[in-house]
Amino acid sequence: TGQFRSVGEAVEVCRAFMEYRKVIFVKKGVYKEKVVVPSWLTNIEIVGEDRDKTVITYDDHANVPLKETGLPMGTFRTYTVKIEGCDITLRNITIENNAERLGQAVALHTEGDRLTFVNCRFLGNQDTVYTGMQNTRLCFEDCYIEGTTDFIFGPSTAWFENCEIRSKADSYVTAASTPADIQ
């Protein structure tokens, strides 16, 4: 009932390197799509109408064959949402990778700096949240994150404030690869 039929369409019309803040309001619903916020988009806030009822979901996993080669796609192409831009905020939204437990399946893949996630849910199994770039900073506030095997991983500096982190299996929660020179 909004101006766009998908979250990806709303992101696509944003201007590159905006100096002002752009807010994308997402109505309640389930959006089955892969969303990429490219590196040239900055100062965007994506706000869901209701955290539990505004869901972006997809079901890729590491063993899905690529159409071009037939080879497995691997971990880093499995994302549901990939954020390459800087100064991006997500609020009141669920990001889910609902692939069966057939290998790595990333819900959130981050590459941008100064990313903020407020009152969001991140759902998956293995590798739910990938903090993907060295020397980038992420802030998670009042979020819920669940998974099975090392489901928060990567080299970014990530701060978790008042978050619930739930392991769905008896396994490791994190697999940080923060460089040794970062304290």
Residue ranges, per PLM feature:
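Sequence-level preference for short, compositionally simple segments enriched
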Residues: T1-Q183
